[in-house]
Amino acid sequence: MSITHRLGAGQAALPVDRDDPSAGLSARKPPLLAAKSLRAMPLTRRYQSCWLTPEGAVQTSTRLAPATPLFEEAFSALARGSVLMTEDGPVAIEDLQPGQSVLTAEGRAERVCWIGSMVIYPGAETGRDLEEQVSLTRITAEAFGAGRPALDLVLGPRARLCLRDPRLRRVSGLEAAYVPARAFLDGISVIEVTPSAPVTVYHVVLEQHGSLRVAGLEVEAFHPGEGVERMIDPRMLSLFEAQ
């Protein structure tokens, strides 16, 4: 036998069987968290830092932190295999150590104070604000002229190239300017590449800011800018121990 509960005005009656109280109840499961909501969750990465202490010792640390643009920029300019010019000759970025001196495009030898690295995983969800953070930029040999670069060069998402052009003076009054490598994408000699396997990318801080000589191109060394300590949580500043 079934009865109908008396409900308030505007509510639909729900028939209930006394012998089977569950009869008539909806079998629908509660809604699951939408996939879109899952993708909206902030991405975190493992960031590795390697720096030179005031005593001249090399220390390293690995921290988990949000994949914010500020952090991504500090760790993602040069892909593994990029070769830099140093006082000791060409050195791959993965073999470079704090304390070594690199040759800058400005004609100086500058000591490396800090090296940061992270791994880009293919297919990682980064959200709309970080969509560009999983793609690399491949610059084919001599895309910018003889020996520039000497060989194909793969740069990280946040690499910036030093552009020296007489026209800059007319526009900005500057002799040179740093431009994102992605700005040169043309689909022919400068190509966007999505890695099919995990790729380690790096960035470098010099004792005095300058341009790294990488395969014949000038790539900006990392500089966080003025007042960065006021922009991020003090707990996150430990990622930049050397500074």
Regions picked out by a protein language model, each given a short descriptive name:
Residues 28-35, 65, 118, 183-189:
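Charged, amphipathic alpha-helical segments
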Residues 79-86, 105-231:
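Long beta-strand-rich cores associated with HINT superfamily self-processing modules
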Residues 94-101:
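Structural motif
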Residues 2-61, 85, 194-243:
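Sequence-level preference for short, compositionally simple segments enriched
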Residues 63-85:
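A short mid-domain helix/strand-loop element embedded in enzyme catalytic domains
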Residues 74, 89-92:
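Short, conserved secondary-structure segments in the cores of folded domains
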